[in-house]
Amino acid sequence: MPRAYPRGVLEISLRLTCLLNALAAGTTTAAHAEEHLNRWAVAHHVNDPDELLALPDHDPIASLPILQALARLEHGGIDHTRAPEDAAADIVRTNPAAPTVWELVLPTPGNYAGLRGPTRIVSEALDAGTAVICHQGAWAGTMWIGTRVGHGVHWRILRANPPLPPMSPLEALQELRAQMRHTADLLEGLGLSAGERPDTVAPRLGSGYSSGDQAVLETAWTVWHACQAGLDSAHEVLTAHGVRT
């Protein structure tokens, strides 16, 4: 069953993913990335409890402005000596010289979206429902989890094992279409008619992404908003189903 996400967190996490990839490609700067994120939430702060960013004089309990975290990501790689023992083997197998690639993951119970541990980190990602993780390159295994706090966002940077490689755009589109057919069959089984197409516009991924990537996002965005509308009216749907049965 589709899950409801905290309002805005999914969109902001998607935007952070695009900006982190742009930083890695050298097509944007930390200052520009911060400015862009501030259009989505008035303030962003970061907690780095494992000190993965290795910032000088950093208190692992305190939070810091996101600009400092973005600048660190822009100019250096992770300190692998700080990685926990259960992640060490994965880090050794990961090529730090490979292009840094970040992805947005939406783990659910029974489908961890490629996450491979540690268990505690996967559990936190499951609770949040969305996370941004680097699956190759100098920051492989670094994960961002965001939480809405008032009009801002609080981010935690955590050490996970590098995840499984993501699907290609074609594979993602095929999987998405299969899920759409499955959902349509379920709705038909409940005797429910189709509603109106959600009036939504998907975010632009940016110049670093292909037209195929954008097409998959636009389809997924429409489906996601349709699912959100269904979840918002879940009580009415269940009541209607009860009357029919």
Report residues per predicted region.
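Polar/charged alpha-helical tracts
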Residues: 50, 54, 68, 174, ...
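Charged interaction segments
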Residues: 133-140, 223
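N-terminal intrinsically disordered, low-complexity regulatory tails that precede a folded domain
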Residues: 1-132
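Surface-exposed beta-loop interaction hotspot
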Residues: 139-193
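Short, isolated positions within intrinsically disordered regulatory regions of eukaryotic proteins
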Residues: 44, 106, 143, 148, ...
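Alpha-helical oligomerization segments
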Residues: 184-245
